[in-house]
Amino acid sequence: MRILLVSNMYPSAERPDYGVFVARLADALRERGNDVRDVVLHAGDRGPIATPRAYARLGRQARAAVAEHRPDVVYAHFLVPTGLVAIATRVPYVITAHGADVRNMRRSPVVAALTKRVLRRSAAVICVSEYVAAQLAAPEGVTVEVIDCGVDTARLRPVPRAQDVNGKGPRFLYIGSLTRRKNVERLQQAFAKLGGGTLTIVGGGPLEAELRATAPVGTRFAGVLSSDGVAAEIAKADVVCLPSLEEPQGQALLEALACGRAVVATRVGGPAEIVTPRIGALVDPLDVDSIAAGMLAAAALPVPSQEAVRVAAEHALPIQAEKVEAVLARAADRSPEIGVRPRSGAAADT
């Protein structure tokens, strides 16, 4: 199957972590024998001037790729504006909603209207969790599948707990951007309540200076790391924490489980579909005491956890790629007109 991949997030030499889950899924589709061509944006294609130009270029590149590659189907990531590029190709398309793109609908009537147009003209929509699918509330007649981007269990394997030579107690790890939504400030407050252990923070963002200034004793900032660097930090940790105010799915969560690590995750969003008391704790992200209690509960679980590894295996990249391939194949078998007019049973665009 000839697939044209369109995404506004994709890794580069400067930002190897940026949209790496999209790239890995594309590679998994290639490994299944598909011919996948990429038309993508990178982290540098951002800013009030750069962004419109980048999307205009993305549209031109997508149309040129259609003429040259003649894809059977377009596989797009993120609803708007990437979905508008998919529409312009006039090829049947499947689009994945990741969460932030769904939140954007609530912030702007214009984005909401454009998103509905993208949904109605799609052959299918893939959501990374049941939570995202519920938040999306796709119009009647739109096919919705729930498939996350998968975790590379061939690369991320369970490793024994590293020896605590300094006797400092549990080693907690946070992986993600340093923004309000990720709730790292409350994680730091919860960690301070424990009175022991270490907390390593991997990632960067606008709150880094503030978080460094208020970090309790035992906190270490590791900065933005490559995928291999993240894997190395997971191997050193006992518990990986993801206490976001809202988390659509949680890629770092699956990576931690694949390494056999216990997790602490927000109960608001997709993690509630994965995390059980046998592999971690779900917490109230607004309650520091709840986060602290979850950290203690997770720290008491075995490391490496075979149950965590088993759960991660259900989301292994080859399994998810096979599911995505099936959705793409169904879309490719349909009329090309799917890509240029509303689906049967859906209301006309407004």
PLM features: what roles do these ranges have?
Residues 4, 164-200:
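Conserved donor-binding/catalytic core segment of Leloir-type glycosyltransferases
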Residues 106, 151-165:
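Acidic anion/phosphate-binding donor-loop and adjacent secondary structure
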Residues 119, 224, 232-237:
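Short alpha-helical donor nucleotide-sugar binding micro-motif in glycosyltransferases
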Residues 131, 150:
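Carbohydrate-associated surface elements
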Residues 209-228:
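Nucleotide-activated donor-binding/catalytic signature segment of Leloir-type glycosyltransferases, i.e.
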Residues 245:
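Aromatic "clamp/platform" in nucleotide-sugar-dependent glycosyltransferases that forms part
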Residues 262-265:
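Short hydrophobic beta-strand element within catalytic cores of glycosyltransferases
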Residues 277, 281-288, 297-302:
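Conserved acidic donor-binding segment of nucleotide-sugar-dependent glycosyltransferases
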